[in-house]
Amino acid sequence: GEGPNGKKQEYDWDAILKTIRRLQPKAVTAIMGDDVRWVGNEGGLGRTTEWSATALMPNSYPGSDEVYKRLGINAMSKDLGSRELVSKASDLFWYPSEVDVSIRPGWFYHAEQDNQVRSLANLVNIYYRSVGCNSVLLLNIPPDKRGLMHENDVKRIKELTEYIKKTFADNKVEKGNRIWTAKVGDTKEYKVRKNTLVNTFLIQEDITKGQRVEGFTVEVFANGAWHHVGEGTTVGYKRLLPFSDSHAEKVRVTITGARGTVNISNIGLYYAEPLVDKTMKVTLSDVPVDGWKTVGMDAAAAIDGKQETVWKTETLTPLVVDMGKEVEIAGFSYAPAQEEDLTGTIYKYNFYVSRDGKDWMKCDATGEFSNIMHNPVPYFVRFGKTYPARYFKLEPVTEINNKAVTAVGEIGVLLK
């Protein structure tokens, strides 16, 4: 490119693309090419609604600037494929999204950044937000002054490769790879292998027949009841939805929106080992705990923003919190005591919300912190929908060793 204050350069894109296709016909041309497009940011984040069938004309096509102006869009627009937008377009393009991000703070090598390589937890999150959101991932790994990839970068890439292979090697859903032809309102149940722990849902469309899903919901059957664990809009080649650990016996998928008949090629459930990003402070609450207060007891240690302080009581006592204002709660976090003695760690629970502190609604959750006895890290429970609430209540049902003790290192609420 021209660089800062550089002279504007003109490129013969037609000749460049023809040369690529002649010499490397299977090469993927990005951004100025018409195979994949830039997602619109360099933070490793795909859109939650991502259409590969889009009204965005490739930049190299004649008249693209006029089309962008007429439709009011560019590569960074949030909406590139809605029905409303497509209805205004004269052409539609199969132009999938490419998420671009660097494994380091910048795109080029700097020795002082050798210890600033993205953590495995961060890269896995990027994978879910890119490949898991119907995009391809371009992960930049800059060569060092030797012309080689630095050892730290190579180590992290190997870790990422092994983590992804291990996570998605074994689909726990029985017959999940059979084609399901469905329309809006259709529901399909799948059996899950017995005695397996899962926390990641996968759904794929047969994109040789196009991209058509506009909305879907996911429920798992566990502990004798169906639980809503997630929902999404577009699917495309692949959509991944993480949810709280569950010993699911069945999974149920419902198509809530579609452009005609949809062709689902794969349904999967997997278990992704939890990762803690040691390079970053784990945020347990999306809502600041300042101004929170517990109701009916002194349990300040559970809401002081410090995992190392613990509220403990010698009974299975519900923890009630007044947040001081109403928010839309999408889930909650529970951190057990960060010490060797795990007595009081909650295993099974109920979670309630209230707008006035009097009338309570039980939230739809699996109701257990699976494997917390052997992996006592913070657990994040997402409901798959939101509840308006000023108050919330965590009710312990059983402790990990069936003792009448409750311990909370920290509790928080999630907004997304």
Residue locations for each model-derived region?
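Extended extracellular/luminal ectodomain segments enriched in beta-structured repeat modules
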Residues: 193-200, 248, 316, 324-333, ...
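Trp- and acidic/polar-enriched beta-sheet ligand-binding modules for extracellular glycan
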Residues: 180-184, 207-272, 314-317, 338-416
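C-terminal luminal/periplasmic domains and tails of membrane-associated envelope-modifying transferases
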Residues: 199, 282, 307-320, 331, ...
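Mature catalytic domains of secreted/periplasmic carbohydrate-active enzymes
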Residues: 1-223, 228-243, 254-266, 270-274, ...
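Predominantly extracellular/luminal regions of secreted and cell-surface proteins
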Residues: 90, 274-304
